[in-house]
Structures are given as structure tokens and as C-alpha cells.
């Protein structure tokens, strides 16, 4: 257990963003599965190139962990930053909408008496609210992609450590899930944003399953070749994204306190 605490503490520095799925209602961004899959497969190949260069003798399980870790385990991974600034990705709200208009209908917004406070609120929401994208007809926040890779890695790390002192894979999996729930409830959710996101937990878990699939029976599996580790198939994000990633289908719990940079939650929630 002493090995698991530092991993949980690491979560404090991992995520703070939230998503307002309702902003994207009636907007219907285009399906970006192909674009996202291309980026993911490029990053996975880059991770494999690094593994085969510096860790060629590692186990399949270690390689799977290194692939997820390659995406980053901190706040706003490089891939998420790239997607947030991309003009090629259809997302909502788009960059073209002025910040003063972008979050006027957000569930996190409230009426304030002074214009300078309104401007502060605009920038606060700009920092904390992530855009919504369409993956195979399912609308998700960009933050879920970081949860998939970064928290998926943390779940997988906890799982592998837990296997050293629990009796079964099922018990190790339950320990990883329990630590994830604890982090979402007390650190990432209530303390940082006032939101407990069930959709975050689902994307965390699916990232963990991806890591397991890489060395088991997933459609994208690792295999040994003369060059080292390689994929037997292409990664497809749609194999893991499901409606429970959508916070309008799988609503969050909103604590009755301050959230999103000291802004009280809206009465609309």
C-alpha cells in the first residue's frame, strides 16, 4: 500500500478541467474519429520507437504502461493542448467564438453585478472548461482523452503493483478502481472543481482496459518481431469510447460549494 500513495498524490497534479456538455447541444460537431485515431496511432508508434530503442528487452506489460505514459500523466497533456489549439478539429465551442460569448449559456455561469467580474468569469471558465468533440457519434469533452491515457496509466500502475500483494487479478483491479474513485471524490473533484464526474471514471477505466488489451485479446495487441515490440493492428478510439463518457448522458454530481475557480455552480445545474 505504501507504493500506491505517491501514485494517488500524483493525481492532484493531473486534471482540473471540466466539461459543459450542454453547451454543445444542437451544435453537432462532425465525427472526428479518423483525425483522432491518426494522432493516437502516431503517438503509439512514437512510444514504440522509444521503447524498442531504449527498453527493447522489456515485458509486454511494461511496454503497455510505457505507451500510455508516453502521452503524459500531468494536467493538459501535449496531445490535449494540440487538440485545443487545432483549427482542423471540429469542436465546440470553436476558437472563432469570442471569449465574451463563448460561455454565456454555460451551466457554470452566474450573473455578476460588475463588468470586470464578468470578464474574470469569462477567463476563469476559459481555463477550466474543455471543448466537446464527436467520436463515433458520442460527444465527449477533450479532457476525457487525457483521462483515458493519463488516469488509465495510473490505474494500470496501481493494478500491477497491487498484483504483488493481493490474491487475484480481480482484487487488483478493484483496488485500482477504488483508488480512482477516491481521487475523483476527494482530490480531483470536490477540492479542485466541486464536480464528481462519473464520465471521468469511465474514461479512466477504459484507458486501463486498453492497457490490459495490449497484452491480452484486444483488437490492438502488442507482439514481438525482429525489430522489437509492434502493434498487430491499428488503434481505434471508438473501441473504448461509449455513451458513459458523455456527461449529459452520464451526469456528474455537483457539490454544494464553490467550483471552477471559486465560482458558485449555476442554479441551472
Task: Indicate residue ranges for each PLM-predicted region.
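Sec-dependent N-terminal signal peptides
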Residues: 3-12
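Intrinsically disordered, low-complexity, mixed-charge
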Residues: 15-178, 188-201, 205-269
Amino acid at each position: 500500500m505504501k507504493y500506491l500513495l505517491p501514485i494517488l498524490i500524483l493525481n492532484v497534479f493531473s486534471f482540473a478541467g471540466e466539461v459543459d456538455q450542454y453547451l454543445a447541444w444542437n451544435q453537432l460537431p462532425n465525427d472526428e474519429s479518423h483525425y483522432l485515431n491518426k494522432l493516437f496511432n502516431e503517438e503509439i508508434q512514437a512510444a514504440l520507437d522509444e521503447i524498442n530503442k531504449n527498453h527493447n528487452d522489456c515485458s509486454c506489460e511494461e511496454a503497455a504502461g510505457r505507451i500510455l505514459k508516453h502521452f503524459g500523466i500531468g494536467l493538459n497533456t501535449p496531445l490535449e493542448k494540440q487538440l485545443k489549439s487545432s483549427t482542423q478539429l471540429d469542436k465546440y465551442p470553436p476558437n472563432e467564438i469570442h471569449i465574451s460569448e463563448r460561455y454565456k449559456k454555460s451551466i457554470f455561469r452566474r450573473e455578476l453585478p460588475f463588468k470586470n467580474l464578468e470578464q474574470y468569469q469569462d477567463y476563469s471558465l476559459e481555463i477550466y472548461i474543455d471543448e466537446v468533440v464527436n467520436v463515433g457519434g458520442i460527444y465527449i469533452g477533450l479532457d476525457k482523452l487525457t483521462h483515458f491515457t493519463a488516469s488509465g496509466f495510473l490505474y494500470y500502475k496501481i493494478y500491477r503493483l497491487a498484483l504483488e500483494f493481493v490474491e487475484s487479478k480481480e482484487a487488483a483491479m478493484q483496488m485500482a478502481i477504488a483508488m480512482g474513485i477516491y481521487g475523483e471524490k476527494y482530490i480531483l473533484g470536490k477540492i479542485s472543481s466541486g464536480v464528481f464526474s462519473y464520465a471521468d471514471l469511465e474514461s479512466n477505466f477504459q484507458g486501463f482496459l486498453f492497457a490490459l488489451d495490449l497484452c491480452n485479446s484486444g483488437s490492438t495487441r502488442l507482439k514481438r518481431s525482429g525489430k522489437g515490440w509492434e502493434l498487430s493492428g491499428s488503434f481505434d478510439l471508438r473501441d473504448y469510447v461509449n455513451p458513459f463518457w458523455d456527461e449529459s448522458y452520464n451526469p456528474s454530481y455537483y457539490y454544494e460549494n464553490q467550483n471552477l475557480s471559486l465560482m458558485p455552480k449555476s442554479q441551472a445545474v
